């Protein structure tokens, strides 16, 4: 009995039995930086997504056809923050403002804020991040971006409002860094709760 409990605690502390390899990547890189996974390289139009079951990066398909953005290419590297869970059941989306990088890569990212849209009346947050050593390394908040590079936010707002069918993505407001980090932390806690629930629901084999 005690050995069963001991094994349970070991597995419980090992990221709650990650369902795929991506889940093993930590939420934070350090105190001030998060990890970020690139699904779509900046300057490209093909839709790629992580398969939730296998953790493999695959071309996104709809009705048997590969999806390609019918608009201008992505204005930055696009992907997600691992070990988060948003309202639609997917990880938190993030766009990286620095140079284009190959898809399927992880990088450390400094979150500076977010843009709040609604998609079919559902909340859709698009988080904004910069590399701590890149072009925007001195930008630490969305206020800095508004002051130093206001056109960047206008580009992001216009792009996300337009890359789907007109009127589908409705812009509501910009979100400052403090609120964005709170939303991000809540999304991580939600991911942890789900993993814990999944673990508890899976009985372990008895070891004599």
Model-flagged regions — what are they?
Residues 2-13:
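Sec-dependent N-terminal signal peptides
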Residues 16-208:
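Hydrophobic N-terminal alpha-helices or hydrophobic patches in metabolic proteins across all domains
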């Amino acid at each position: 009995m005690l050995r069963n409990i001991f094994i349970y605690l070991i597995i419980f502390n090992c990221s709650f039995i990650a369902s795929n390899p991506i889940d093993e990547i930590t939420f934070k890189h350090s105190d001030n930086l998060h990890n970020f996974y690139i699904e779509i390289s900046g300057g490209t139009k093909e839709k790629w997504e992580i398969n939730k079951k296998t953790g493999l990066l695959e071309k996104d398909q709809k009705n048997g056809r590969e999806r390609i953005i019918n608009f201008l290419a992505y204005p930055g590297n696009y992907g997600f923050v691992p070990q988060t869970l948003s309202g639609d059941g997917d990880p938190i989306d993030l766009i990286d403002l620095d140079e284009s990088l190959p898809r399927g890569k992880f990088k450390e990212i400094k979150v500076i804020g977010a843009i709040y849209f609604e998609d079919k009346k559902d909340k859709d947050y698009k988080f904004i991040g910069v590399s701590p050593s890149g072009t925007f390394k001195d930008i630490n908040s969305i206020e800095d971006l508004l002051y130093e590079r206001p056109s960047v936010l206008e580009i992001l707002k216009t792009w996300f409002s337009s890359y789907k069918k007109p009127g589908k993505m409705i812009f509501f407001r910009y979100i400052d860094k403090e609120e964005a980090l709170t939303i991000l932390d809540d999304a991580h806690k939600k991911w942890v709760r789900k993993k814990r629930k999944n673990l508890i629901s899976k009985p372990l084999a008895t070891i004599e």
